[in-house]
A protein has these predicted regions:
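Active-site microenvironments that recognize anionic phosphate/pyrophosphate groups
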Residues: 1-127, 133-192, 198, 211-212, ...
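Gly/Ser/Thr-rich active-site loops/lids in small-molecule metabolic enzymes
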Residues: 200-206
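Extended C-terminal subregions enriched in glycine
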Residues: 206-219
């Protein structure tokens, strides 16, 4: 075996500052399970019955037990929407518990909670699940966003989609993906650990609502990427950090992906064929 295949390190482009994690071992990661679903009860990762569950990733992108998998339900055919508010609340509570636990580690400066749903965005197992990466630094994008005083749009107007209690969802005005949603509490909360009982219920209801609308948009399960932006755990001062959720999909129409191509990659300027206000109108009508 070539020893280079086990290479794992972090490199930074000297001119652009881009951080690249070189993880040779992930080339050996199976694209699809060879026998049965490892996340179903009795499978490799879930020998006992469960409602929600987390475990360390067998194919981590980073060393030091800083990559985890979160199972939303034992039901293989479920969706986040079919969990209902009670099931979604269980997931949120587990997300919050893992954020608080990982965030106390000296080698963790930022906890990213995320989901890739569908093979179109890289999911290799269909069972409902998400992941957590615990970074030993604050990555550039959330650092810039949270450090710049980001706040939810107080008056999104035609870009408004839905609201539940103290949480609301709207389409961002300058979305880089054809489908994009921003979810946030109306009053500042820095991270999931600070979100109170009512706030967690409102977030659960809003996630169940908007993810259901997204699946109804094209009358089929929508591939999406979802992630939380929240206070870094590096011990620094983040007085303006405001918890928020982003959901994006590459589909510009049913089954048709919009590819981020050469001009956009080269210049980091984007061309979105979907008008945010029209997307918001469609999603409102699906409520």
């Amino acid at each position: 075996m070539n020893p280079m295949t086990d290479l794992s390190d972090t490199r930074v482009d000297p001119y652009l500052g881009t951080v690249v994690h070189v993880v040779g071992t992930r080339q050996a990661r199976p694209n699809l399970p060879s026998t049965g679903c490892p996340f179903c009860v009795g499978g490799l990762e879930s020998p006992e019955p469960y409602q929600v569950r987390w475990f360390r990733n067998r194919w981590p992108a980073m060393p030091g037990d800083r990559c985890e998998v979160v199972l939303y339900t034992s039901e293989h055919e479920a969706t986040f929407t079919s969990l209902g508010v009670a099931g979604a609340r269980r997931v949120i509570d587990l997300w919050a518990e893992r954020f608080c636990s990982l965030g106390t580690r000296d080698d963790v400066d930022y906890v990213l909670i995320f989901e890739n749903r569908g093979p179109e965005v890289g999911a290799t197992i269909a069972h409902p699940h998400g992941q957590i990466y615990a970074y030993d630094h604050v990555p550039s994008r959330p650092g810039r966003l949270l450090g710049a005083g980001w706040t939810p749009d107080a008056d999104p107007g035609e870009r408004f989609v839905a609201a539940h209690g103290g949480w609301s969802a709207s389409v961002p005005p300058a979305a880089t993906y054809p489908i994009a949603l921003s979810l946030a509490p109306r009053h500042r909360v820095a991270d999931l650990g600070e979100l109170d009982d009512a706030g967690r219920n409102d977030l659960a209801a809003l996630l169940v609502d908007v993810l259901g609308r997204l699946d109804r948009l094209y009358d089929r399960p929508l591939p999406y990427m979802l992630w939380f932006n929240q206070r870094p755990t590096d011990g620094g001062e983040w007085p303006d950090a405001w918890l928020n959720v982003e959901i994006v999909s590459p589909w510009r129409s049913a089954g048709t992906a919009r590819f981020i191509a050469a001009a956009e990659v080269a210049c980091e300027e984007y061309f979105n064929p979907v008008i945010p206000e029209l997307l918001a109108e469609q999603l409102r009508e699906l409520g």
